[in-house]
């Protein structure tokens, strides 16, 4: 059944491109940002995940398009998408059903504002992935995401975070500074995060920021690993 084209959507969804189009059949959403960034992000993920086995947890999966796209390329991995917003959970399940991928689990609701958040079925993760979340969420989400990586990543696991970031207190482009100001004007708890602050969070949780990979449109992928496994192999 098609959802009404004028169905109200969450405020940040409309404004920050987590979906951007009316739901298609069964609630599938299509995010313009996905089409712009998924291949560039994959170039960073591929060396770690293309031949890996195990479980990957995506936090803030949005429409679900990244999950199903990357799951298609990694048949030996089981992907666990998650989100907090109900329209996103519906969309993720719709994309999972539409693609018929056996290695994508049903989406689960995870609230990263909760310090002790967990995931189902639990256990060690090969990787965690978080795309375009930290700048449109309170600082506690950054804290709890990285703390969760410290709890759940296996010995060789990686946490990948994509989005705009400051570098050592400096914006990487005037447009990012303007974007940051607009975010903080809308919600003082939002804003472009600084890699220096995220690295400090990582160190407090037994992790290290091992790579900062430039992406198109002044974005980056940050790669975190356990402090005793800081090589990129």
Model-found features: residue ranges?
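Conserved class I S-adenosyl-L-methionine
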Residues: 52-62
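Class I SAM-dependent methyltransferase SAM/SAH-binding core
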Residues: 57, 68-116
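Conserved beta-strand signature within the Rossmann-like core of class I S-adenosyl-L-methionine
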Residues: 156-165
């Amino acid at each position: 059944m098609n959802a009404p084209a004028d169905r109200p959507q969450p405020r940040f969804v409309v404004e920050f491109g987590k979906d951007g189009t009316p739901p298609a059949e069964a609630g599938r959403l299509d995010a313009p940002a996905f089409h712009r960034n998924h291949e560039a992000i994959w170039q960073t993920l591929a060396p770690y995940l293309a031949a890996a086995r195990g479980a990957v947890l995506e936090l803030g999966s949005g429409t679900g398009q990244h999950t199903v796209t990357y799951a298609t390329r990694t048949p030996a991995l089981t992907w666990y998408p998650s989100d907090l917003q109900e329209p996103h959970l519906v969309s993720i399940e719709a994309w999972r059903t539409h693609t018929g991928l056996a290695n994508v689990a049903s989406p689960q609701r995870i609230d990263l504002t909760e310090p002790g958040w967990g995931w189902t079925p639990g256990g060690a993760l090969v990787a965690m992935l978080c795309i375009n979340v930290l700048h449109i969420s309170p600082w506690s989400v950054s804290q709890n995401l990285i703390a969760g990586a410290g709890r759940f990543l296996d010995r060789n696991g990686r946490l990948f975070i994509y989005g705009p970031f400051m570098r050592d207190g400096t914006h990487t482009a005037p447009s990012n500074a303007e974007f940051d100001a607009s975010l903080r004007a809308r919600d003082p708890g939002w804003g472009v995060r600084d890699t220096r602050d995220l690295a400090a969070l990582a160190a407090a949780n037994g992790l290290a920021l091992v790579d900062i990979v430039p992406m198109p449109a002044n974005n980056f992928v940050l790669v975190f690993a356990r402090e005793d496994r800081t090589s990129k192999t």
